[in-house]
Amino acid sequence: MTLHAQQISLSIGKKQILKDVTFAARAGALSAIVGPNGSGKSTLLKALVAELPSEGQISLNGRLLQDYAAWELASLRGVLPQAAHLAFPFTVLEVVRLGLMAGPEAQNTRLPFEALARVDLEGYAGRSYQELSGGEQQRVQLARVLAQVGAPMREGQPCWLFLDEPVSSLDIAHQLTVMDIARQFADGGGGVVAVMHDLNLTAMYADHVHVMTGGETAGAGTVADVLTDQRLSEVYGCDLRIGKVPADAAVFVLPQTARA
């Protein structure tokens, strides 16, 4: 089963943000979208989940998005937004329960607590969401998404996580916790699409990388094929070098000097 988007274009006002982008991700894999600020990463993710209207075709698990009922999509995919702010005075538990409202597990009282435990927030259920730090709010939102989709597979179909910069507000320990959760979800047969800024975390966890620049695709493929010195240096406008850890040949990205 796959996610497939073909010739996606999107404009806001008179400004074109995405230009004929084709994107593919498969269930059982973690696909990362990377690129510099303003390259169209988050806009592409929003187009993939139909949060923003776009030209082109998008299919999920073999069906066009428009052929799904809203409740079907809610049970198959969870979306973690970049901004975690909520204007209402919810408790943490109430926020996580929002993820259950549209699905078959709406009355499941156990799932929200299990989801909070997975993101290291046991004991936070009764706390005010607005009083949490940005990183804690980000983890609460991930718990909401996990409660919504449940397991990586449902009735023989893969479920999907769409994560917009899921570790941007987190310390290194919780970055690894969140990426481990995403990796485990993919290893369990689900699909994960994540907008990432950290190229080293991308190299550690991703199976597939899609590089964006100027609203267009600059490369797509495996970590080894896509994360190259030349491509990254051109896309990011600075001198980047790819190295490998001797013990296991894992790829890492090492910045050199900024371009003059």
Curated annotation (Swiss-Prot):
Keywords linked to the UniProt accession: ATP-binding, Cell inner membrane, Cell membrane, Membrane, Nucleotide-binding, Translocase, Transport
InterPro entries named in the record: AAA+_ATPase (IPR003593), ABC_transporter-like_ATP-bd (IPR003439), ABC_transporter-like_CS (IPR017871), P-loop_NTPase (IPR027417)
Cellular location(s): Cell inner membrane
The protein's role, per its UniProt record: Part of the ABC transporter complex HmuTUV involved in hemin import. Responsible for energy coupling to the transport system.
Name under which the protein is recorded: Hemin import ATP-binding protein HmuV
EC number from the UniProt entry: 7.6.2.-
GO cellular component, one term: plasma membrane
Coiled-coil ranges per UniProt: none
Subunit note: The complex is composed of two ATP-binding proteins (HmuV), two transmembrane proteins (HmuU) and a solute-binding protein (HmuT).
Stretches assigned to the ABC transporter domain: 3-239
PROSITE patterns (UniProt xref): ABC_TRANSPORTER_1, ABC_TRANSPORTER_2, HMUV
Originating organism: Ruegeria sp. (strain TM1040)
One Gene Ontology term of the molecular function aspect: ATP binding
Database matches in Pfam families: ABC_tran (PF00005)
PANTHER family: HEMIN IMPORT ATP-BINDING PROTEIN HMUV
Lineage of origin: Bacteria, Pseudomonadati, Pseudomonadota, Alphaproteobacteria, Rhodobacterales
Membrane topology: Peripheral membrane protein
Residues noted as binding ATP in the record, renumbered to the chain: G35, P36, N37, G38, S39, G40, K41, S42
